[in-house]
Amino acid sequence: MSYNCFKPGKSWLDTNGKPIQAHGFSVFYDEKAGLYYWLGENKEKTTGKNHIWHWGVRLYASRDLYNWKDRGLIIPPTPDDLDSPLHPTYCMDRPHFLYCEKTGKYVMWLKIMAGEISQFFSIMEADRLEGPYTYVHKVYKPLKMDSGDFALHADNETGKAYVFFERPHFQLICATLTDDYTGVTGEFSVHYDGLTPPMTREAPTFFERGGKKYLFTSGTSGYFPNPSKVCMFDDYHGKYIDLGDPCIGDKSGTTFNSQITCVLKVPNKDLYIACADQWNPQWWIPMLAKQISKGMERHFAGYQPDTSPKEEHPLPGVETRHKENTSIARYVWLPIEWQGDKPVIRWKDEWKWEEL
């Protein structure tokens, strides 16, 4: 099967006829290769009836953004080692990487949640995008904080790089990275402070246009969708201006039943694509969104976050049964439009990037 357009929320198969399995993902263009790459969490074995949360990090390649060839697992799981952050029972999410010009390394950051208790980063590096990757830090707690969903960005003008991450469940942190991108310097700033679920901001997604910097963020409601927000700023550690919900005509308040995970700038065009996971493709999910949010509000009423320093502890070494069948998750890719400096997103049943 081949494609010649995007059909958001519909089944999307690779060139082998299998569902694309790369969630919590990054998409980018490699000018030298003339290829787009897409990497993310492989959920093919996550049925909701076993101990498997992920099955490694999978890579795809494409020349047209519609048809994707499976390049295999660039970071495989380690099912025989419960002391490894990559054991499939641990919640490995949102693999994101930066290429470090100074070291010539591809630096991959992974969010890990072990036993619903400890959230941290595992940081790996490789000489090639395809790997093999080796650990720099198996368990890394930036600024002695727990860390949830995150985004990475390297500033082309200054050479500095940054990580944006949720400090569960009450702050969004922006921290400056070390020169080799494998840790933080200690410089950081706090944003969206004091919110509690479902309003706590997670799934930060950075992009920039016309000298302005932006973050899409989601609320906190597990795999159930919720309204996105977008903010704008000039200084990474300065004031973030909240621009509200970017989604126009989204009556369900669910980001069109999806969660944005990255923004792709199409080369040689003023076109930005909001790329999102549709974790629950069932038609009735948006109908439950407000009910789920109200339940989260009740559950977290009076929540007092633990702000004590977090130490790096060994993994629990215990398998956890997972109830979510994310092997059926799909994708929603939509073009970003502009109302002045505000990015907005409208639903399209199908569309072609060449026509915009």
Question: Where are the predicted features?
Answer:
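Carbohydrate-active catalytic/glycan-binding domains of CAZyme proteins
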Residues: 1-356
